[in-house]
């Protein structure tokens, strides 16, 4: 943590095709080795596949999928008197988005489809229907928080 001042958030330019800041942020999560144009191709390709299969607009499905993945609570380790407790804490909105996007991309990378665009599209469709490994990850995190609810008074 900085001692002098809090560092401000950087402005992210909205993506060129849909004008969405959320989608631009998502492309940055998908990007590897600074290859932004490749990340754009993957994301736009996935959104086209999703729109064809689901029959809804590109952004609508993306936001539905992300809504079903975003966690509301998570656990953080807190050391109290020699023992470590998993303390449930509420997730801030910015972190909520970041975790949801990261889990979506991680789940897509572990899938078996041929191209990354197909994997991402399949994971988005699953997430929009409350299925898939990204949604499972969110449920696991919520289950951990629920199991450790007794330690909620150790919040800081």
UniProtKB/Swiss-Prot annotation:
Please name the NCBIfam families in this protein's record. Answer: rpsG_bact
The UniProt keywords, alphabetically, are:
Ribonucleoprotein, Ribosomal protein, RNA-binding, rRNA-binding, tRNA-binding
Single GO term (MF): tRNA binding
- Organism equals Pseudoalteromonas atlantica (strain T6c / ATCC BAA-1087)
Its recorded name reads Small ribosomal subunit protein uS7
Function noted in UniProt: One of the primary rRNA binding proteins, it binds directly to 16S rRNA where it nucleates assembly of the head domain of the 30S subunit. Is located at the subunit interface close to the decoding center, probably blocks exit of the E-site tRNA.
Superkingdom as given in the UniProt entry? Bacteria
Quaternary arrangement and interactors, per the entry?
Part of the 30S ribosomal subunit. Contacts proteins S9 and S11.
NADP: present as a keyword of the record?
no
Q: Name one GO biological process term.
A: translation
The record's listing under PANTHER family reads:
RIBOSOMAL PROTEIN S7
InterPro entries attached to this UniProt entry:
Ribosomal_uS7 (IPR000235), Ribosomal_uS7_bac/org-type (IPR005717), Ribosomal_uS7_CS (IPR020606), Ribosomal_uS7_dom (IPR023798), Ribosomal_uS7_dom_sf (IPR036823)
Q: Which SUPFAM superfamilies match?
A: Ribosomal protein S7 (SSF47973)
| Family in the record | Belongs to the universal ribosomal protein uS7 family.
One CC-aspect GO term: small ribosomal subunit
Q: What is the lineage of its organism?
A: Bacteria, Pseudomonadati, Pseudomonadota, Gammaproteobacteria, Alteromonadales
